[in-house]
C-alpha cells in the first residue's frame, strides 16, 4: 500500500502547530489562561517575533525519525545495522546535545543538528537532558527512573511515521514506540501510551472511511492484546482513553470541564486529552487545537498529539493556512515527511546514488 504523502506532512505539521500553540500556556491554570486571553481562553498563536515557536515535543519526534532513517540507510547501504532502538537512542542523545550551550561533539550523525530551527533550546523537561547524558538508558524491562510525564511521548510519532507495512511487523513497531519513550521515562504510564499512540497514528495515516472512534477502538484492542498481560498498568491506560471517549459523547459537557477532568498531566492522561479533543472537533482542526490547549495541564503535549492525529487524518492540505504561514520549521518538517514517505532510495551495490540523501543520512547533513 502506497504511503499518503499529504497525511505524513499533515501529521508532522499538525503536531508542530499544536506544540507551538500550547507552548504559550503550557502548565498554566485555566484561570491564568482566561485572565491573559479572555473568557474563551487562547484561540490561536501568541506569536514571538512573528513566529510560532515549537518545543522539544516536535524536536524529539523529528530527531527520532531522523535516527531511524539513518539506521535503515546504513542497513541498505552497508549491509548491516544495529537494532532500531539504538538509532533512536543515538538521535535522542544528539538532540539533547542541541539543548545545551556546551559539549557538542565534533562528529554528529543527525542532519537536523545542522538546522537551527530544530535546535533551539526549548526542552520542556530539562531533567531529560541529564538522563540522556547517562549510560545506560531505560528499557521496558528496566526503567531508568519512574518518571511519568509526557515529555518524550512524541517520539512515538516519529516511530509511527517510519513504519513500513510491507517489511515491518506492526506489533514490533508498537513496541518500538514504547521503547523510544522508555529510554528516558521508566513509568509504564509514560511509555505504554507511546505504544498506543504509535498504533493510533498508523491507523490514521491510512486513507479510509473508518471513523476515528473505530480506529481508536481497534488500537485499544490491539494494545490490550499485546501489553495487557505484560503490564498491569495497561488497563489504566485503556481506562483513561475510554473515559475520554465517553466524555466526547456528552454534548452537554463544556470542553474545558472535560479536559480538567482528564487532568492531562502524565503521559496516559495527555493521550486521553488529545483523543477527546480530536473526537469532539467534528473534523475542524482549529476547534481541536483550541480544546487541546485550554486547560490546566500540559497544553503543549496535548496539542502536539492532537495535532499529529488530526493532521494525519485530514492531511496537510486541510490544515488552515494561518497556522502554517508563521510556523517556524514548516519547510523542514515537510522535507522530513517526504523522506519518510520515500525511504532510502539506495541499496548496496546499486548504481543509483542520491546525493542529498547521502549527505543527510550518511554524513549528518554536512
Give the role of each language-model region.
Residues 1-366:
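Structured, active/binding-site neighborhoods that engage oxygen-rich ligands
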Amino acid at each position: 500500500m502506497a504511503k499518503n504523502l499529504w497525511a505524513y506532512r499533515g501529521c508532522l505539521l499538525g503536531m508542530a502547530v499544536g506544540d507551538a500553540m500550547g507552548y504559550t500556556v503550557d502548565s498554566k491554570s485555566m484561570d491564568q489562561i482566561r485572565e491573559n486571553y479572555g473568557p474563551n481562553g487562547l484561540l490561536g498563536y501568541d506569536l514571538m517575533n512573528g513566529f510560532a515557536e515549537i518545543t522539544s515535543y516536535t524536536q524529539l519526534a523529528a530527531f527520532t525519525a531522523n535516527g531511524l532513517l539513518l539506521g535503515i540507510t546504513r542497513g541498505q547501504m552497508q549491509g548491516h545495522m544495529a537494532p532500531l532502538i539504538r538509532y533512536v537512542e543515538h538521535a535522542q542523545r544528539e538532540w539533547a546535545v542541541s539543548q545545551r550551550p556546551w559539549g557538542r561533539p565534533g562528529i554528529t550523525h543527525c542532519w537536523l543538528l545542522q538546522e537551527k530551527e530544530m535546535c533551539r533550546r526549548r526542552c520542556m523537561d530539562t531533567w531529560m537532558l541529564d538522563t540522556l547524558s547517562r549510560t545506560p538508558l531505560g528499557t521496558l524491562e528496566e526503567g531508568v527512573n519512574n518518571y511519568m510525564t509526557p515529555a518524550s511521548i512524541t517520539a512515538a510519532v516519529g516511530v509511527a511515521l517510519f513504519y513500513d507495512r510491507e517489511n515491518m511487523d506492526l506489533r514490533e513497531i508498537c513496541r518500538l514506540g514504547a521503547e523510544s519513550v522508555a529510554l528516558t521515562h521508566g513509568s509504564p504510564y509514560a511509555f505504554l501510551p507511546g505504544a498506543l499512540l504509535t498504533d493510533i497514528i498508523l491507523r490514521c495515516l491510512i486513507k479510509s472511511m473508518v471513523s476515528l472512534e473505530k480506529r481508536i477502538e481497534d488500537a485499544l484492542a490491539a494494545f490490550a492484546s499485546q501489553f495487557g498481560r505484560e503490564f498491569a498498568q495497561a488497563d489504566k491506560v485503556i481506562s483513561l482513553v475510554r473515559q475520554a471517549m465517553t466524555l466526547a459523547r456528552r454534548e452537554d459537557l463544556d470542553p474545558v470541564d472535560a479536559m480538567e477532568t482528564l487532568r492531562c498531566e502524565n503521559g496516559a492522561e495527555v493521550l486521553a486529552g488529545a483523543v477527546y479533543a480530536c473526537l469532539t472537533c467534528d473534523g475542524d482542526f482549529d476547534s481541536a487545537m483550541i480544546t487541546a490547549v485550554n486547560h490546566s495541564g500540559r497544553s503543549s503535549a496535548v496539542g502536539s498529539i492532537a495535532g499529529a492525529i488530526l493532521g494525519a487524518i485530514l492531511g496537510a492540505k486541510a490544515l488552515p493556512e494561518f497556522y502554517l504561514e508563521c510556523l517556524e520549521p514548516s519547510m523542514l518538517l515537510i522535507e522530513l515527511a517526504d523522506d519518510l514517505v520515500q525511504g532510502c532510495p539506495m541499496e548496496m551495490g546499486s548504481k543509483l546514488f542520491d546525493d542529498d540523501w547521502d549527505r543527510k543520512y550518511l554524513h549528518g547533513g554536512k
